From Swiss-Prot:
SUPFAM superfamilies: P-loop containing nucleoside triphosphate hydrolases. The keyword Cytoplasm applies. Residues 30-59 are annotated as: NMP. This is Adenylate kinase. Monomer. Residues 126-163 are annotated as: LID. It comes from the Bacteria. Coiled coil: none annotated. Gene3D superfamilies: P-loop containing nucleotide triphosphate hydrolases (3.40.50.300). Catalyzes the reversible transfer of the terminal phosphate group between ATP and AMP. Plays an important role in cellular energy homeostasis and in adenine nucleotide metabolism. Belongs to the adenylate kinase family. It comes from Geobacillus stearothermophilus (Bacillus stearothermophilus). It is found in: Cytoplasm.
Length: 217
């Protein structure tokens, strides 16, 4: 079961990744984790990636693909994998397809957790944090008993600067522009499966299970 998981910030991708990994026993492979592991192991590609990252540069695709290849060749990926955060571009998607063919594998599905922008805005701008004790709330999913007041210590709740509407809208726009060509690419290839991410998280996972045939471990 070889999967790629896609979704904009706030779509609930992390939650669904955890559920897929628990149900199917395949490793959750994120770009950040891959880079950190390769650098820790001191592999030639890991050391190359570290040089770029230490300079604040983007890691070139050929290095990233090499690290992905090394990761997918490990024993825990023999029954499948869940790629998250990679590929990010059509060039990376094409390179991934070539690399998988080289090792005799191919993708089964690209799962796209689809949520409208207005719903994402609501989710991402709803976070509130207590100035006093740091407790986290959400205006929709975990509201305080009294608006603007922390349940735990009575402190004032505030919205972080990076959670305000202008910042969130810009982040979503950047991500949407980056992701749309990738969605189109995988749709043309026949791998893409859209899952309605506006439902309850258990219903979202039920839809994913149905797509994957409900074959839990």
């Amino acid at each position: 079961m070889n999967l790629v998981l896609m979704g904009l910030p706030g779509a609930g991708k992390g939650t669904q990744a955890e559920k897929i990994v628990a149900a199917y026993g395949i490793p959750h492979i994120s770009t950040g984790d891959m880079f950190r592991a390769a650098m820790k192991e001191g592999t030639p590609l890991g050391l190359q990636a570290k040089q770029y990252m230490d300079r604040g540069d983007l890691v070139p695709d050929e290095v990233t693909i090499g690290i992905v290849r090394e990761r997918l060749s490990k024993d825990d990926c023999q029954n499948g994998f869940l790629l998250d955060g990679f590929p990010r571009t059509v060039a990376q998607a094409e390179a991934l397809e070539t690399m998988l063919a080289d090792i005799g594998r191919k993708l089964d599905y690209v799962i796209h957790i689809d949520v409208r922008q207005d719903v994402l805005m609501e989710r991402l701008t709803g976070r509130r944090i207590c100035r006093n004790c740091g407790a986290t709330y959400h205006l929709i999913f975990h509201p305080p008993a009294k608006p603007g007041v922390c349940d735990k210590c009575g402190g004032e709740l505030y919205q972080r600067a990076d959670d305000n509407e202008a910042t969130v809208a810009n982040r979503l726009e950047v991500n949407m522009k980056q992701m749309k060509p990738l969605v189109d690419f995988y749709e043309q290839k026949g791998y893409l499966r859209n899952i309605n991410g506006e439902q309850d998280m258990e219903k979202v996972f039920a839809d994913i299970r149905e797509l994957l045939g409900g074959l839990a471990r």
